[in-house]
């Protein structure tokens, strides 16, 4: 059985847009650069050609990866999950016990995780601890050194 990629509908749409961009924009651009670099002659010492071929390999690999993620995407449906329960696709806000600063993240599938925009993977240590918990629960979150105790204050 193939691995599934749990994700939100938004994440799937983003992957489809990336795939379209890779196939319709990036792939043709790199093919054109390869043609231009070939016209310079001797390919054995042609750094432009080598760079374009490397980029082409990266683009083709990314296309393959994205196609696989789309093919085996599993869209989450939170309709059957309690409103105050942490689950993939939901936003969770928590506060470290004894502190006042709240932190909020959306739990998403690995394919759409981006910590810089507040989206953390459901496979991350913090998400694994939070998933299934409810507002008011106090949990220990593992850190690289030790752990921190947090209270879930909001789920939406």
UniProtKB/Swiss-Prot annotation:
GO terms for molecular function: DNA binding; RNA polymerase binding. InterPro entries: GreA/GreB_C_sf, TF_GreA/GreB_CS, Tscrpt_elong_fac_GreA, Tscrpt_elong_fac_GreA/B, Tscrpt_elong_fac_GreA/B_C, Tscrpt_elong_fac_GreA/B_fam, Tscrpt_elong_fac_GreA/B_N, Tscrpt_elong_fac_GreA/B_N_sf. GO terms for biological process: DNA-templated transcription elongation; regulation of DNA-templated transcription elongation. Residues 2-27 form a coiled coil. Gene3D superfamilies: Transcription elongation factor, GreA/GreB, C-terminal domain, Transcription elongation factor, GreA/GreB, N-terminal domain. Transmembrane segments: none annotated. The keyword Transmembrane does not apply. The keyword Transcription regulation applies. It comes from the Bacteria. Signal peptide: none annotated. Keywords: Coiled coil, DNA-binding, Transcription, Transcription regulation. HAMAP family: GreA_GreB. Belongs to the GreA/GreB family. Necessary for efficient RNA polymerase transcription elongation past template-encoded arresting sites. The arresting sites in DNA have the property of trapping a certain fraction of elongating RNA polymerases that pass through, resulting in locked ternary complexes. Cleavage of the nascent transcript by cleavage factors such as GreA or GreB allows the resumption of elongation from the new 3'terminus. GreA releases sequences of 2 to 3 nucleotides. This is Transcription elongation factor GreA. It comes from Lactococcus lactis subsp. cremoris (strain MG1363). The gene is greA.
